[in-house]
UniProtKB/Swiss-Prot annotation:
Record's subunit section: Part of the 50S ribosomal subunit. Contacts protein L32.
Gene Ontology MF, one: structural constituent of ribosome
InterPro entries xrefs: Ribosomal_bL17 (IPR000456), Ribosomal_bL17_CS (IPR047859), Ribosomal_bL17_sf (IPR036373)
PROSITE patterns, per database record: RIBOSOMAL_L17
One GO term describing the cellular component: cytosolic large ribosomal subunit
Keywords, in A-Z order: Ribonucleoprotein, Ribosomal protein
One GO process term, biological-process aspect: translation
Protein name (record): Large ribosomal subunit protein bL17
Family statement: Belongs to the bacterial ribosomal protein bL17 family.
One Pfam entry name: Ribosomal_L17
Source organism: Aliarcobacter butzleri (strain RM4018)
Amino acid sequence: MRHKHGYRKLSRTSSHRKALLKNLAIAIIEREKIETTVPKAKELKRYIERLVTVARNADFNTHRQVFAALQSKEATKKLINEIAPKYEGRNGGYTSIVKTRIRKGDATPMAFISFI
């Protein structure tokens, strides 16, 4: 049984899931709005909100911690220098998920996830 399980598996191995979330996080940081499936968007929301909370500190160790999660210099710089300062006075709730459509090929519910 999966009672009180802490995260969505997304039908992937742990390494595949980590790579997926990292790539989706880089995409939303670069574009600030992406379309993905609803379960992926919900899991990405948890992942990216933790990163933004860490990035608000903006010291040297924060750069290292964010880079360790993203492995992208450009995304790390943009998150720490542009995105995180917007949310200085806000405690969480940096992203929003808007359900959009049902994908034609496999009837999967899709959603936009974007920074507020």
